[in-house]
Each structure stands twice: as C-alpha cells, then as structure tokens.
A protein has these predicted regions:
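Short, hydrophobic/aromatic-enriched beta-strand segments in well-ordered soluble domains
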Residues: 14-17, 42-44, 200-213, 292
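A contiguous, surface-exposed recognition patch within enzymatic or periplasmic domains that forms
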Residues: 36, 47-55, 59-201, 209
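Asparagine-centered strand-capping/turn motif at beta-strand->loop junctions
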Residues: 43-48, 239-241
Length: 301
C-alpha cells in the first residue's frame, strides 16, 4: 500500500537520554515501499567528558509453540549462558545445561524441548543473521545485521514447563507462550558492555524481516534468504527475496567448480524459488549455492 497515510519510506524517530550517565540513544524506523523488511538506524552518543559503558540488545517477542525452532547460522555449534558461565553443544545438547539433563541428546533449538527458563547465545559466527521458524505455518522472522558490529545472537524462553506455563497465564490472556529473539550490537554476551569515549558516537543498522517456506535458513541478507538441504542424493534449493528481484541467477556447484544447476529467475516475497537437483554421490559439505545478478556480481552464497 503506497498511500501517503501509511507513511512508507518515512522515518519514524525516537530518542531518549538515560538518567544515570546521560547517554543519548536515537532510533529511526523505516518501512520501504515494495520491501518486506523493517530498517532500524541507531545512534548512541556519549554527551559527557568521561568514558561511559553501554549495552545494546534489540529484543522482539516472538510467538512460539510446539512447531517453533530457533534458526541460528550453520557455523554455530555451541552456545553460552549469561556471563559465559555455562556452555552447551548446539543444536543437539548432550550434557547438563541450566541444571537440565540433556545427556540423551536433545534438540534445544526447538522450544518444546526446553522445560525450564533458558538463555543461550551463539559462540562465534561469520554470518549476519539469526531468527526462528514455525514449521506448521512455514513462516518465520529473521534479524540481519553486519556480524562485525552485531555479533550477539540470543534466544530466551520462560520454558515449556509448569513454570513457563504459569508465566504465560500471568502475562497474557489469549496469546500463549513467546520467546525473546535478542540481537546484541558490539557484544555477543550479557552483561558484556562496550565503551563510549568522551563525546563519541556509534551508529549501526539492523533489519527485521518476515519470511516464508524457506525452513532452516543457511544464509541471508536484507534482500535474499537461502536454504540448501540434501536428502537421498537430492539437493533441495529454496530462495526467498524481500522485494522484487529480476534476472537473478541461481547456481549450484561443487567445490571443484563443476556447475550442477543454474537458472535465471524473478524473485519476490510471493514468488519463492524452489528446485530439486540430483547430486548423485556428492557430499552436502561439497556443495555451494550462489546467487548472481545479471552482471555476474555475487549477491549471496
């Protein structure tokens, strides 16, 4: 809807000065025409002649149920508790975490498998995204930001047990359970603060975007989302775009450079690209899925 009353393309701004250290925070929220994402531009400013600390985590609440699972990047194999006091394998926990015995091997990316209040934060990732997905409705939410500035990737839940259910009753009449999808800037853990020098300003951008039918995301930008799964010698390719994108080449190759599949297509939130490719005896880790524009520029892989 491009009507002026909707304000698409306008920047909705808010700012505040916190009372203890007089640090100023400013945020601008923008919905762009024909783009299925929310852009957030942030600035923090130290108004004093003294070094100050700050801690920044964006924190949307996400509805969850037995079909929900967190979507962490494929290079996240372990997660930390607050203050890095405890650590667990991820997504399959195999030990004690939050005093819960997962030694049989439990997928803690799934909300239904976490019985007690639990936080987990990714340990190192070179990817720019984190999010979650509901299998039964085939839809989810992603956060995208430069991982050099925004390394924090976290999920918090009250837990899918008696204690969590009691909190659901206290917090909502009808909406049911939720998780907090938390994204840290200049920090990958809590409470891990960052410094602002006297009169220093820091700024960054964050994006939140809905997506559908992609499943367990393997890579993403604000413009494209990729998934590549392999089962029974077949590669399942899914590509989602947050806006209309024409003449996009989808290419699947192996690590030797041999092209196994390529196709030029038009993408949009309504036109999700899906394909299946026979890969014979290829190992999944030897496959590379790439997107190129019509000039041959690599967009994502």
């Amino acid at each position: 809807d491009r009507s002026p009353s909707r304000g698409l393309g306008d920047v909705y701004k808010r700012q505040e000065v916190e009372r203890m250290f007089n640090t100023k925070g400013m945020q601008g929220f923008t919905l762009h025409p024909d783009k299925a994402y929310l852009e957030i531009n942030v600035k923090v400013y130290n108004r004093t002649p003294f070094p100050q600390t700050f801690l920044w985590w964006a924190n949307p609440a996400v509805v969850v149920n037995d079909h929900y699972h967190s979507v962490f990047p494929p290079d996240v194999h372990a997660v930390f508790d607050h203050g890095k006091r405890d650590v667990s394998n991820f997504p399959i926990a195999t030990g004690i975490y939050y005093k819960q015995d997962y030694s049989e091997g439990v997928d803690i990316s799934k909300y239904k498998n976490i019985p007690v209040p639990t936080s987990y934060m990714a340990i190192k990732s070179r990817y720019d995204f984190v999010g979650g997905y509901e299998e039964h409705v085939q839809a989810g939410l992603l956060h995208v930001a430069d991982h050099h500035l925004s390394p924090g990737k976290k999920q918090w839940t009250w837990g899918n047990g008696d204690f969590g259910i009691a909190w659901d009753r206290n917090l909502t009449d009808e909406d049911g359970p939720y998780i907090e999808l938390m994204t840290g800037v200049y920090t990958d853990n809590q409470p891990d603060f960052t410094w602002l020098q006297p009169y220093e300003e820091k700024s960054w951008k964050q994006y939140f975007l809905p997506y559908s039918e992609v499943g367990y995301v393997k890579n993403a930008t604000k413009d494209f989302i990729l998934n590549l799964d392999v089962a029974e010698n077949t590669a399942h390719i899914i590509v989602y775009a947050t806006g209309r994108q024409e003449n996009i080449k989808v290419e699947l190759r192996d690590i030797t450079g041999k092209i196994l599949f390529d196709k030029v297509t038009i993408l949009s939130p309504e036109n999700i690209f899906k394909s299946q490719v026979n890969i014979a005896e290829q190992l999944p880790e030897n496959l590379i899925l790439s997107l190129y524009d019509n000039n041959g520029k690599l967009l994502l892989e």
